């Protein structure tokens, strides 16, 4: 009798165990999906540029409160912008191989929950930055609106120059870091914005060349779709040359020293080298290689900026 009861309970026990396993594995997946919506790797890069802006804003070490609250606030706002981008692009994402598996595109997270999540991050970030100063709070909010609304809703679908115009919002973090520490605008901070702004088109156009068919299928007027791949390659090369010139400005204005001049020149020449290969070498892999190099290029460029600043501070 006991044996038969045990056998009879086996399916129930198995079901309970399966349910427990499902619950234990589904929760981490949900949290991973929410994290995915914030584009953590992109946010990390933005925070690095913001941190460099903070450090360059003052001769010595910036105030701990400004650094901590500034990075948290800018991070929350950047994550909110990314999450709003997921919400607004959820239908478009289903048509592209690069984005079809995103949480909202796959229906793993309900739209209203994503909106609440993004709104919460936005409000928290704004309040934290207000604790520092109103200028940083409102500039960061303007950047969020510029990316999540102006770029995602309008520019992305309106013009092949979407990346150029919309790049202003993505180039703001160094300025935001600067104002978080000083509470005021400075021409040197705008130079940092110019660096990221000039870097943005060749970075994204290299990706757009690699994913041209995806963008064409989704009806997004990226430059390779509207003007062709060869024209876009030429523009990538042109912008890398422009970036080399803009990259000299921090040294020419006395903002940075010789360490930066050498480091940035080598990095920018490397970018030009990749752009030349992209333009003249007959290989489909060069677009992706150029895109990957551009990521490390920006990270290294800002590390060189920071290193030069600290070396100069120690010497003088």
From Swiss-Prot:
Gene3D superfamilies: UbiA prenyltransferase. PANTHER family: 4-HYDROXYBENZOATE SOLANESYLTRANSFERASE, PROTOHEME IX FARNESYLTRANSFERASE, MITOCHONDRIAL. Carbon 2 of the heme B porphyrin ring is defined according to the Fischer nomenclature. It comes from Photobacterium profundum (strain SS9). Keywords: Cell inner membrane, Cell membrane, Heme biosynthesis, Membrane, Transferase, Transmembrane, Transmembrane helix. This is Protoheme IX farnesyltransferase. The keyword Transmembrane helix applies. The keyword Transcription does not apply. The lineage of its organism: Bacteria, Pseudomonadati, Pseudomonadota, Gammaproteobacteria, Vibrionales. It holds the Pfam family UbiA. GO terms for biological process: heme O biosynthetic process. The chain crosses the membrane at residues 42-62, 67-87, 115-135, 136-156, 163-183, 189-209, 235-255, 256-276, 295-315. Its EC number is 2.5.1.141. InterPro entries: Protohaem_IX_farnesylTrfase, UbiA_prenyltransferase, UbiA_prenylTrfase_CS, UbiA_sf. It is a multi-pass membrane protein. One of its GO terms (molecular function) is protoheme IX farnesyltransferase activity. Residues 1-21 are annotated as: Disordered. Pathway: Porphyrin-containing compound metabolism; heme O biosynthesis; heme O from protoheme: step 1/1. It catalyses: heme b + (2E,6E)-farnesyl diphosphate + H2O = Fe(II)-heme o + diphosphate. Converts heme B (protoheme IX) to heme O by substitution of the vinyl group on carbon 2 of heme B porphyrin ring with a hydroxyethyl farnesyl side group.
């Amino acid at each position: 009798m006991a044996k038969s009861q045990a056998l009879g309970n086996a399916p129930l026990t198995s079901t309970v165990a399966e349910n427990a396993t499902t619950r234990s594995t589904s929760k981490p997946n949900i949290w991973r999906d929410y994290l995915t919506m914030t584009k953590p790797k992109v946010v990390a890069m933005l925070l690095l540029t913001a941190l460099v802006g903070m450090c360059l804003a003052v001769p010595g070490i910036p105030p701990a409160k400004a650094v901590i609250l500034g990075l948290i606030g800018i991070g929350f706002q950047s994550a909110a912008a990314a999450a709003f981008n997921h919400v607004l692009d959820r239908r478009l994402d289903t048509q592209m191989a690069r984005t079809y598996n995103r949480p909202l595109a796959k229906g793993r997270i309900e739209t209203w929950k994503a909106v609440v999540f993004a709104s919460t991050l936005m409000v928290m970030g704004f309040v934290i930055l207000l604790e520092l100063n109103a200028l940083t709070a409102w500039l960061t909010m303007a950047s969020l609106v510029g990316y999540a609304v102006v770029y995602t809703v309008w520019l992305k679908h309106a013009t092949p120059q979407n990346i150029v115009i919309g790049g202003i919002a993505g180039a703001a973090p160094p300025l935001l870091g600067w104002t978080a520490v000083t509470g005021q605008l400075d021409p040197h901070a705008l130079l940092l914005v110019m660096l990221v702004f000039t870097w943005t088109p060749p970075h994204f156009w290299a990706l757009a060349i690699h994913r041209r068919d995806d963008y064409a299928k989704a009806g997004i007027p990226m430059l390779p779709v509207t003007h062709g791949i060869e024209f876009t390659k030429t523009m990538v090369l042109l912008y890398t040359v422009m970036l080399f010139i803009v990259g000299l400005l921090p040294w020419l204005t006395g903002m940075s020293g010789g360490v930066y001049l050498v480091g940035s020149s080598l990095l920018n020449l490397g970018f030009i080298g990749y752009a030349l290969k992209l333009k003249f070498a007959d290989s489909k892999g060069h677009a992706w290689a150029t895109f990957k190099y551009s990521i490390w290029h920006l990270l290294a460029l800002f590390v060189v900026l920071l290193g030069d600043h600290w070396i100069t501070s120690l010497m003088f």
